[in-house]
Swiss-Prot record:
InterPro entries: DUF520, UPF0234-like_C, UPF0234_N, YajQ-like_sf. Keywords: Nucleotide-binding. This is Nucleotide-binding protein Sfri_0732. SUPFAM superfamilies: YajQ-like. GO terms for molecular function: nucleotide binding. CDD domains: YajQ_like. Gene3D superfamilies: 3.30.70.860, YajQ-like, domain 2. It comes from the Bacteria. The keyword Nucleotide-binding applies. The keyword Nucleotide-binding applies. Nucleotide-binding protein. Belongs to the YajQ family. GO terms for cellular component: cytosol.
Amino acid sequence: MPSMDIVSEVDEEELRNAVENSRREVAGRFDLRGKEIEIDLKDNVVTLKSEDDFICKQLVDILRIQLSKRNVDPSSMEVDEKAVHSGKTFSLKVNFKQGIDSLVAKKLVKAIKDSKLKVQAAIQGDSVRITGKKRDDLQAVMRLAKESELGQPFQFDNFRD
C-alpha cells in the first residue's frame, strides 16, 4: 500500500547559504555601506543587527529574497514583531519553523478527511503519515497540502509504493 510522510523542514545548508549570500549583498549595496550590520545564524535562528530599525526591515527583505533564490520557502520564517533596541543597535530575530506543530497537523488531517479521498492520515510527532490504496490518491493529497493556506510550507518524504 503506498504511503508518504508530510513534513515541514528547512534545509540547514540552504539556509546557511542564503545567510552568506545576504551578507555578501549587504556588503555590496551602496545604501548600506558604512553602516554597522551583522547577520548571524545559530540553531535555525537568524539574528539581524543594525544601527536603525528601518535597516533591520531591509535586512529581512534581503534575507527573504536570498531564501527564494535558494529554493527555501520564506513562509517558514517567523520574524519578531518589533526590533529590540539595545545600546546603539537594533536587533531582530528570525526563527525558522521546523516540524509541523499539533494544531497545524490537526487542521491538515481535517482538510484531508474533508476532501473525501480514500486515504488514512495519522499524526506522528512532527509529521503526518498518509496511507492510501492508489498512488493517485497520494498525489491528490500532495496537491491539497500545497494549496492549503496553513502558514507553513510542506515537503513530502518516504514516498513508498
